[in-house]
Amino acid sequence: MKKVFKKATATVTAAAMLASLTACGGGAASSATTAAPAADTKAEGGAETTEAAASGIDNKDIKIGVSIWSSTDVLGSQCKLILDEAAKALGVQVQYVDQGHVSEKVTASVEQLAAAGCQGIIICNSSDTEMTSAIKTCNDNKVYLAQFFRVISEKNSADIYQAAKDSDYYIGAVHEDEPENGEELVNILLEKGDRNIGLIGWEQGDATWLGRWEGYKAGVEKWNKENPNDKATLSEPQYAGTTSEGGSKAAEALMAADPDLDALIPAGGGGDPLQGAIAAVERAGKTSDIDIVSTDFLPDLGERLENGSMAGESGGHYCDPLISFMMVYNAIKGNYKDFGGKFEDVPFPYLYVSSPDDYKAYEKYFVDQLPYTDEELVDMSKLSMDDLKAAAAKVSIEDAASRAGN
């Protein structure tokens, strides 16, 4: 039984789009800068631009740093694509540091970007504790800071949350509802009839992973309470890190531990662990026996929904860092101010697909083309904070279709 979901967000997942990316160096602590394009030059995606960029504003002295786990894996490269497009449209520089979600590299990345002259930084950290150092570095250097794909827990990290709120330079966080995401995904499996579910995490203690895990468990618990004669089980997690090899080994371990395994949830980690898990299931000849759901759209998701190697996926959220980028940009420009005593919390929706037809609608507006034109990106940069939050909340296939005139 297929579910129809109304939640949506924007992401680019086409292999053709990914091919246009220029890698930002290899390894977990690499760095690269994309400058505002000069007159009659080519931007990173190959489009011709003018010195003033699409906005007509000369922002060439603005540099925004991006601290990200990877700018070259499936999800990270999608994020880089939209951020590079926004930088091109606004005529600003953007510099990336890949930190691999290794705590010491996460904190060092903020120091590196501040030292490089960035006036603002957006960060996808691994754990809340890293934000203590990140906030201090930004306070000391008078650099604006916003999170993407992450939010400091007011409940579990009260002191860090308060430090963020007290800061004159910490703006806020753009993030998804991960417990809800986890519950939606496990429900796809339960409604398909799967009852023995294996779980693959990426990094122990990662706040996003813990939120998704909470949702998986809640979904199974609710199912078992409502269906006492048809109970499901959820394994303890195997950890894969953020590599394809890790995902493959984790899937192999789960299949070996439970011969009756009929579903896998590679929880995330940028897309590479999922690819490894799929490959392991295919090698074992169990593609038709084990349903797989995950988060972070793959470039070939449509094909995988067709051939059964994927049962469903949540994703389409690569525009999350775009919102953080716009927050920092406006802070640098002086349009957003007076951050001390405030914490700007910006929820961002997921898109769920569990059939080829679901994916076709998504593909039309987010794979075959970018979800925003340069003109629309410039218009977004002029929104108030409240209007930017509203724009984030309504990102959807329907919204993109409407803006495209369909």
Regions found by a protein language model. Give the residues of each.
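A residue-level marker of the well-folded mature domains of exported/periplasmic proteins
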Residues: 2-7, 17, 24-406
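Repetitive helical segments and hydrophobic/amphipathic motifs
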Residues: 12-16
